[in-house]
Amino acid sequence: FIKDDELMANPPHSPFDERVDAIMRIINAHADRTGKKVMYAFNVSDELDAMQRHYEKIVSAGGTCAMISLNSVGLAGAKKICDLGALAIHGHRNGWGMLNRHPLLGIEFSAYQKLWRLAGVDQIHVNGIANKFWESDDSVVRSMEACAKPLLGGMSVLPVVSSGQWGGQAPETFRRTKTVDLLYMAGGGIMAHPNGAAAGVRSLQKWWEAAVEGLTMESAAAKYPELNISLDKFGKKSG
């Protein structure tokens, strides 16, 4: 899974249609070669008519996912895109801090996520353990648990774990949630790996293997010495 940045919609320096063509050319070629198609979430956030055009561009190019900035497009905009039905919908909650950071303002995530699930989103951001923002680990865990609860007898929504993630948080994330039914998103944790992006991806996979084995960050690094590369690079921020 790969996604656009939530601030990257249709700017002059990266026009939406050109970006879709460039990225899907690589993804489709990779799928033809390997039989595995990477899901890429293109950020369609815009006015309603433009969002629908962006959505149709993804479909015609062979894409599988559209991203919307929930707090920017609103419930009506989100439902309009979700109702089109051809793509998975990745819901980004950028701007969430203004709705929840102060205890006397806004809405609790357990209620917030229900609104977007009713609109039809398939994936929704929940922050992450030992994240780079203000939110506590306890709050993140509550958010993940809320996503796992069936709504109106239906399906759950996939929590998207992100924000300063590099792999070392995986053991604590799994210890506290006991699930691998999530998207674990890392930007710098992959791209800034000392041995390159491919090594960054392999490192995340190995950290999660260790997490499911029940290892702590320290015991994982002891059992799998290659994990010390990311540990030395990104520090011991694990939860």
Regions found by a protein language model. Name each.
Residues 2-5, 37-43, 68, 125-126:
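Short beta-strand segments at enzyme active-site cores
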Residues 2-20, 128-135:
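Glycine-rich, proline-tolerant flexible connector loops at the mouths of alpha/beta enzymes
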Residues 4-5, 33-37, 214-222:
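Flexible, glycine/charged-enriched surface loops at secondary-structure junctions
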Residues 5, 40-45, 161-165, 186-188:
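Glycine-rich beta-strand-to-loop/alpha-helix junction loops that act as flexible
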Residues 16, 21-24, 77-88, 133-148, ...:
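C-terminal helical cap(s) of enzyme catalytic domains, especially alpha/beta-barrels
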Residues 18-19, 23-38, 42, 46-59, ...:
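N-terminal active-site wall of soluble small-molecule enzyme domains
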Residues 53-55, 61-186, 199:
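Catalytic alpha/beta core domains of metabolic enzymes, predominantly
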Residues 103, 229, 234-239:
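Ser/Thr/Pro-rich, acidic low-complexity intrinsically disordered regulatory segments
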